[in-house]
Amino acid sequence: MSRFFTTGSDSESESSLSGEELVTKPVGGNYGKQPLLLSEDEEDTKRVVRSAKDKRFEELTNLIRTIRNAMKIRDVTKCLEEFELLGKAYGKAKSIVDKEGVPRFYIRILADLEDYLNELWEDKEGKKKMNKNNAKALSTLRQKIRKYNRDFESHITSYKQNPEQSADEDAEKNEEDSEGSSDEDEDEDGVSAATFLKKKSEAPSGESRKFLKKMDDEDEDSEDSEDDEDWDTGSTSSDSDSEEEEGKQTALASRFLKKAPTTDEDKKAAEKKREDKAKKKHDRKSKRLDEEEEEDNEGGEWERVRGGVPLVKEKPKMFAKGTEITHAVVIKKLNEILQARGKKGTDRAAQIELLQLLVQIAAENNLGEGVIVKIKFNIIASLYDYNPNLATYMKPEMWGKCLDCINELMDILFANPNIFVGENILEESENLHNADQPLRVRGCILTLVERMDEEFTKIMQNTDPHSQEYVEHLKDEAQVCAIIERVQRYLEEKGTTEEVCRIYLLRILHTYYKFDYKAHQRQLTPPEGSSKSEQDQAENEGEDSAVLMERLCKYIYAKDRTDRIRTCAILCHIYHHALHSRWYQARDLMLMSHLQDNIQHADPPVQILYNRTMVQLGICAFRQGLTKDAHNALLDIQSSGRAKELLGQGLLLRSLQERNQEQEKVERRRQVPFHLHINLELLECVYLVSAMLLEIPYMAAHESDARRRMISKQFHHQLRVGERQPLLGPPESMREHVVAASKAMKMGDWKTCHSFIINEKMNGKVWDLFPEADKVRTMLVRKIQEESLRTYLFTYSSVYDSISMETLSDMFELDLPTVHSIISKMIINEELMASLDQPTQTVVMHRTEPTAQQNLALQLAEKLGSLVENNERVFDHKQGTYGGYFRDQKDGYRKNEGYMRRGGYRQQQSQTAY
């Protein structure tokens, strides 16, 4: 080093081990200026030359760490900002990546971020609670990450197939590349074993916990030692504090010189330090392996697992070793477990597991069925409480456990008739182990089954109805019905009347909407035509659904003391009658129950059931050809325009002022599952066709009547919509088919009307959905012919003097007695002014109706009369007001003076002039 910078000493300081030259403080009198003072950090730091790879990768890891922190706090906006910066940083490191390959930690963050965004996207409840910025950022970032990950699709796929290998490779690579890395980085990119166990499962056993603790301690020691080594290599001036103090006296220029080993001794010292560091690292690894081998020899065989693979959990110890398992001990442990139920932070899955283990212990120690039944009750209740949110449905595995547990409980109750369960039994009066007396357990099996039915409904409500998953869940209904039937048999023997009514209602609710195809087939096939084997099979199948519904409902009618259960039973009974085309029984039961008078006071689920029943009643009447009854039954539902909502099959779009989020959640819980839905297009088609068959003849009969009423406003609305269209093409939708058929019927063209109502498109949309589709189509053709005949006679009666009934029969393809009957009814009801000539079989028109010209003259006269009446009324009104005003002013002129006198005089003058 040049001696230009040294003023107070001619020799170099040999006390420094690193070989750094120390110079004394310059004499102050030479320049008269103080040297530049540096902070301690600047004094102690050393300029280190780093490779471009380290710089770029460190920039990427810092951004990844920020993204992971934002993911933890659900800050999607921050994730979006950092992801954009991450993409730019990766672009800068592209040249290095091309040489070295895509780093694993970069692939990991891309895969984790995409999974995280998909999880947020599927969480509908969480999305609703997001603020506007986060929701917008979520949508934007989800699109960007999906587009960005296409370039890394193969890397991400290989990472997801074996994430453990990726973690191991990264760990080894980090150890080789950067020996000064801390455990904090590992926690950011991966999850340590201890952290994983804390997150995923309960604490491990004692030996494994000790083993993991040693590993963590070694990591901490290695971290400290590596930091110390880095400190040693960073300070090349001295090893002692005194030498550091002396080093502070170096000249200003020497502080900014880049330190590098210039002599052979310096190079040898640096190499020796590197060798010492590698040796220490090797010693640490060997020491760790030796300790692992000792643990293997002492505590059995240990298996090294890769990061991310969950350890096999050992069964928790319920009782201390050597404890005598008695009834009191088990009940005490049960109460301890139940005390944590419902508390914040309680692991519900672990609680269920503990209860199941307690059942096994009770069974192994032969503590009796009473204790097992009590624990089973609590297991089922814990399964129901697994989801604290009412809107959340049970997971499939929990649902399966629930069904199995209820079946096991019913097996025990049927196998042990001496066990009595009931919610009126106090815990103090329970008898769980005294076999000399009947066993008494507090609990209600009916409540558990009712809750099971509610959970099944929630599962069906929250499953996509068009997926295979819905079909799989629907198969569970057979198990649900079997459990309800078993509980029904049990309660018929040991339950109260109220409990029997409740379980009967559950059985009815799972039966009323199902069409009994076997019973229907037996009705179509007479007993004489069926073989003996078929008759025996029919007898073995048990009672028909009609007989079952009759028996269950009659019991409720007679025994039930609550109006709600009886009302639901009546509505289900009517629905079942209507579904099986027993129109008169369904109608009579509805009229005798008088439900339509006070149904508005019922709760919403019962009102939905009433609406469903009325709709099914109207469809039943339509199948029987009773179009007027069908129209009246469907009028209230269809005229409101809210059929979907009234039937509990969905919500209509409304403004937020009409429904808040809480109301929307409540209404969604009231929706019926998809397999109970009534086809809304079929419902509307039945209503419009019924309205067409009623409205078109009525319009033809009262064509000249300006004050005629409308039977169906919705049907007239559809007609007006069809008339407003400037260009009419072939009908496509169901409504267009009905409108086109109505126009054809208005002209008396029944064949065209028939072709619009019954064709392949309408068959696929509507008519094939009926159980007896051919019968319905035959009925429709007959009704179209009859109503077209009536419309033809109303429209063209003024044209004919007489018309032969045979001609009408041939024209509308009806037999002569039917034509005779229709015309006779029209004459009797004074709808058609004509008479029948029996010898000639002709209809003689009386021409009492005015002609078209006379109708126009009558309409003109009526309008002129109304115009005159209006003019006279207006004139009288004006005269009365003016006269009263004049008299008041005249009176004021007589009695008052001044201004009022002058005003009255002026008005009197104007009146005289007028």
Curated annotation (Swiss-Prot):
Subcellular location: Cytoplasm
Biased segments, Polar residues type: 523-532
One GO location term (cellular component): eukaryotic 48S preinitiation complex
Skewed-composition ranges (Basic and acidic residues): 199-216, 261-278, 887-900
Composition bias, Acidic residues: 166-190, 217-232, 291-300
Residue positions where Phosphoserine is found in the record: S9, S11, S13, S15, S16, S18, S39, S166, S178, S181, S182, S910
Pfam families: eIF-3c_N, PCI
GO molecular function, one term: RNA binding
Region annotated Disordered, chain positions: 1-44, 157-302, 523-543, 886-914
Residues modified to N6-acetyllysine: K99, K644
Domain of life assignment: Eukaryota
InterPro entries to which the protein is assigned, alphabetical: EIF3C, EIF3C_N_dom, PCI_dom, WH-like_DNA-bd_sf, WH_DNA-bd_sf
Post-translational modification summary for this protein: Phosphorylated. Phosphorylation is enhanced upon serum stimulation.
Domain PCI: residue ranges: 674-850
Compositionally biased intervals (Low complexity): 8-21
Subunit description: Component of the eukaryotic translation initiation factor 3 (eIF-3) complex, which is composed of 13 subunits: EIF3A, EIF3B, EIF3C, EIF3D, EIF3E, EIF3F, EIF3G, EIF3H, EIF3I, EIF3J, EIF3K, EIF3L and EIF3M. The eIF-3 complex appears to include 3 stable modules: module A is composed of EIF3A, EIF3B, EIF3G and EIF3I; module B is composed of EIF3F, EIF3H, and EIF3M; and module C is composed of EIF3C, EIF3D, EIF3E, EIF3K and EIF3L. EIF3C of module C binds EIF3B of module A and EIF3H of module B, thereby linking the three modules. EIF3J is a labile subunit that binds to the eIF-3 complex via EIF3B.
Family as reported in the entry's similarity comment: Belongs to the eIF-3 subunit C family.
Protein name as annotated: Eukaryotic translation initiation factor 3 subunit C-like protein
Gene: EIF3CL
